[in-house]
Amino acid sequence: EVCIPAADKIPLILRETREWLDIYFSGKRPDFTPALAPEGSEFRKMVWEELLKIPYGCIITYGQIAKQVADRKGILRMSAQAVGGAVGHNPIGIIIPCHRVVGTGGNLTGFGGGIRTKEALLKLEGMDMGRFYIPKKGTAL
């Protein structure tokens, strides 16, 4: 027998997250973000904060995020590869939208859920996939 708790017994963060995901997967833009608190290094958290700024249905490159992080840290430059590493350690995919990050020139690369999943999420958000290079092999298809 499966015991399902009453809605008022489910923690608020789980109710908010479920509501957010229901809205998102219905093809709509949620107008709130659950109050999640992922754990990670200061650098990773900074990158994840930048990911949360990417609007629904939009993309950004690893290099652009690197520039934003460098600006915040008050340094001249930041490695796009270092940003890619932080993006790859995102513990809350979809809500922290790492699928909206693409390589230079629109290459769909580096998504833990696989490139086909990244493609599906971007399509759900209304992106025209004809503008992207989608690899046939490799890079976590």
List where the protein language model places each region:
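General nucleic-acid-binding
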Residues: 1-17
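Nucleic acid-binding interface residues in structured DNA/RNA-binding domains
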Residues: 19, 23-141
